[in-house]
Amino acid sequence: MSKPVIAIVGRPNVGKSTIFNRIAGERISIVEDTPGVTRDRIYTASEWLGHEFSLIDTGGIEISDAPFMEQIKQQAEIAIDEADVIIFLVSAREGVTDADERVAQILYRAEKPILLGVNKADNPEQRQDIFDFYSLGFGDPIPVSGAHGQGVGDLLDAAVAKFPTDLEEEDDDSIKFSLIGRPNVGKSSLVNAMLKEDRVIVSQIEGTTRDAIDTKFMAENNQEFTMIDTAGIRKRGKVYENTEKYAVMRALRAIDRSDVVLVVLNAEEGIREQDKKVAGYAHEAGRGIIIVVNKWDTLEKDNHTMKEFEDHIRNQFQYLDYAPIIFVSAKTGVRLQNLPAMIELVSENQNRRIQSALLNDVLMEATTVTPTPAINGKRLRIYYMTQVAVQPPTFVVFVNDINLLHFSYQRFLKNQLRKTFDFTGTPIHLIPRQRK
């Protein structure tokens, strides 16, 4: 099911990022800290009392060279386009300003629920003195303090109560995938080329609230796929469409809904920082990943070119050592016919379940070949392992002391699982648990 989206909007210096971080809390790093992954806190998954949602800080979207009010206007429009619930943030310290009133004018046309949060209400007097904000026309102001956390729960209670009840259920059997990558890597031409590869387009599904178009098609083996619409592929250019952070935000939304993510690189331009950033998000979200090098036809090649390019990718994306790499050309169609089977394989590996008996056979063999380490005379003992989840495959390993299970030995155990059960294209998570 698509998760609801909350966007925080307001003029500069009202504390949007403080509220964003307060709501997001530690969930920004919920999966793991991955070396080589650059985080951008503009967009994160969060949860309140069992309700999962995505959170956008529009203040993190900076439109370069745009006038002050034009930036605010565009940030508000992003919220109107993307969000299910909008938090309009103002400041108790400054009271109602001209800039607040201009933001309000833009938000009046939004056919979305809007909550008025009065930030920096850090003491009882400020929490009481919020009546002027009724003049903005968004109902009861909700006093909050991003610095101290007061009132944030009330704001989230109000937001959750406004979540739409008709978000599209995504429980069909099709494999959902998206193509992500910075502008000019050829996502659009790759989409069009894939849909021309002797497959039948089943339907184009209009998104309920967000202009997205998902395309279903059938592969030759009758496996159904859903191509998730991604930033900039079909949506025509508004001013902010080309800003890097906005593109990243849209890519994250696509990742959120995908089973498998195709990270598209441009063979002509090589690997850029934004490539690594977005790929890192897909990795940390636990999605299946395929690295697709497009425009392969444009390079002059010899017998070593592909191997050298692959080695360069492995060096730059060390945390994606499990992701297969395919070199394609949307223009000539080379190797595009291999993509559906590769997507299907990665999806199967994402959903692979291993019986506990087989896992413990692997564990026994692994600890025999490479005995467990000892720290300060105390040796790690591993009792057993069991799988607790899929998408991605997640395993709990029970030990005598979790402090003895060093990262390097965890990596060794993961490698043994991959060696035995493949898991091509999917991250695997290992959770140590201390047996009492």
Swiss-Prot record:
Transmembrane intervals: none
Family statement drawn from the similarity comment of this UniProt entry: Belongs to the TRAFAC class TrmE-Era-EngA-EngB-Septin-like GTPase superfamily. EngA (Der) GTPase family.
Complexes and interactors: Associates with the 50S ribosomal subunit.
Binding residues annotated for GTP 1, in chain numbering: 10-17, 57-61, 119-122
Stretches assigned to the EngA-type G domain: 4-167, 175-351
Protein keywords: GTP-binding, Nucleotide-binding, Repeat, Ribosome biogenesis
Organism: Latilactobacillus sakei subsp. sakei (strain 23K) (Lactobacillus sakei subsp. sakei)
Entry-linked InterPro entries: G_ENGA, GTP-bd, GTPase_Der, KH_dom-like, KH_dom-like_a/b, P-loop_NTPase, Small_GTP-bd
Keyword Repeat: yes
One biological process term in Gene Ontology: ribosome biogenesis
GO molecular function, one term: GTP binding
Protein name according to UniProt: GTPase Der
Lineage start: Bacteria, Bacillati, Bacillota, Bacilli, Lactobacillales
Gene encoding the protein: der
Binding-site residues, GTP 2: 181-188, 229-233, 294-297
The KH-like domain, residue ranges: 352-436
Role: GTPase that plays an essential role in the late steps of ribosome biogenesis.
CDD domains, per the entry: EngA1 (cd01894), EngA2 (cd01895)
Highest taxon in the source lineage: Bacteria
Any single Pfam family the record assigns to this protein: MMR_HSR1
